[in-house]
Amino acid sequence: MPEYVQLGSRRVGAGEPCLIVAEIGANHNGDLPAALEMVRRAKDAGADVVKFQKRTVELCIPLEQQGEIRTTPWGQMTYLDYRRRLEFGEADYDGIAGLCHSLGMAWITSVWDEPSLQFLLTYDPPWIKIPSACLTDISLLEACRRAGRPVVASTGMSTEDQIKRAVVALGPDRLVLLHCTSTYPCVKEELNL
């Protein structure tokens, strides 16, 4: 692997300044004004990048979970409807992209499936982010590699063999691996340090 990876205008690697990414994820609850306020607050706090999540819910939610009834901030609804409500579309991301551009701030989304990757690529992202839950989706990883962008991949819940397979699928040249834990609080036996 190289000594550093170029992520947009920033180099990431040993001896480089820390790149601070504010994780917005889906904490906006599908509310664009709330998301835009989070972007502003992240900028004010010194973040370099804001990160969202993008998924095609019909592809990412197992069929047996889609009809489960959940209690949500908007009342009772199926899990599929709840996840749909959290997703932003093109007009929303246009607003996010515009605000980030005006603030001189990069933005990115974790992509959970190939249609979401293709959607993200229309915005010319500085890199592609793979969430821990998708590290074993070799088809998605290979599509990310073909996109020709640097990739940042999280490794929570993954075994060493799964991580090695992901590195092969993504290619090591422009890859940043994030050591992640997916249990909070994490017991020391699961830290893998």
Residue ranges of predicted features:
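Catalytic cores and adjacent flexible loops of soluble metabolic enzymes
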Residues: M1-L193
